[in-house]
Amino acid sequence: MVHKVHALKILKNISMNPIIEYESLLNTNKQFNDAYLQTFQSVLESGWYILGDKVKRFENEFANFVGSTHCIGVASGLDALMLALKVYDFPAGSEVIVPSNTYIATILSILHCNLKPVLVEPDLDTYNINPTLIEEKITSKTKAIMIVHLYGKPCNMDEIMEIAERYNLPVIEDCAQAHGAKFKGKQVGTFGTGAFSFYPTKNLGAIGDAGAITTSNDDLARKFRSLRNYGSEAKYQNDYIGYNSRLDEVQAAMLSVKLKFLNEITEHKRKLAAIYLSELNEDFICPAVSDVYFDVYHIFNIRHPKRDELKAYLLKHGIKTEIHYPIPPHKQKAMLGIISGIYPISEEIHNTTLSLPISYGHSEEDILRVIEVLNKF
């Protein structure tokens, strides 16, 4: 009976205000629906569904947006990362520097290439890889540095590129969460090889899985195009051990529709982030702000020592949140026997982080309500 009364109280609290979803793709995409339907009809009637004009158009548009010479559309963000490594044909067992605080896909891409991930702890202010810790992890087996612009905030690319150039190591940028982010005015995905995801929840999201690679290296671009299509540059001629990782015409066409609004989406999210940063009280650790970082706030995360209690409290008041991410990569079951070492900074982040609603479908009023509830915790 006590449990029923408690449940009724929660329902009463929620019913007083509409639920604020962490993100609703229906709300995020509703303004694009008419254009999406027309675009889908156009692709359907074209009779060409793989690597056609729609893919070429989006590749050109996204390359121009990023500021790279080439964009190569692929099937997913994970595939983009894998191909960004595969193109170098590193010997099996070679080491790749990678942040310990990231989504598992970053590390999976290394393992799928028969390479060894060497984890580097993040900076606790930015949550991105700490450049001052990279050099001590470089050995004679190190072949590349893979960095992640996590949550939409770019890494410190000055320090990373200086180390990479000194050791003659290629840099692969995981830009899955950072479309349009800039470091000192330069877009991510142009410092090294950029790997992008267009998963539906991303700032530039497709209506399914999709990804892309950006580069200004003509030779790499040619090989990327071959690797994504069975290692073929000419029909029925295969020069490499390739893959089937092609961006399809439907997703490319939908992405072209949404790309036109990406700057608007980014500015909306930055406006919502500014409200959080201005109005949240000091009990919550908010994302660091600096003039050198143009943060696109794919995710707005706060940190709090009572994260789980806070998450439950917000849900009680009709506000849904997420955790990015509840389990760090080195503690995942799949990584047993693969990754060793202790990563206390990553664990601190994973144990205290909470992602708040901040999408194109949220209003300023939504954010003010979240803040009002948070500040009463």
For each feature predicted by the language model, list its residue ranges:
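Active-site phosphate-binding strand-loop segment of PLP-dependent enzymes
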Residues: 125-206, 212-214, 355
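PLP-dependent aminotransferase class I/II
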Residues: 6-14, 26, 38, 55-60, ...
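A glycine-/small-polar-enriched, mobile loop at the entrance of the PLP active site in fold-type I
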Residues: 23-28, 37-57
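Helix C-cap/helix->beta junction micro-motif
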Residues: 113, 166-167, 317
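Phosphate-binding glycine-rich loop
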Residues: 48-95, 108-113, 119-121, 186
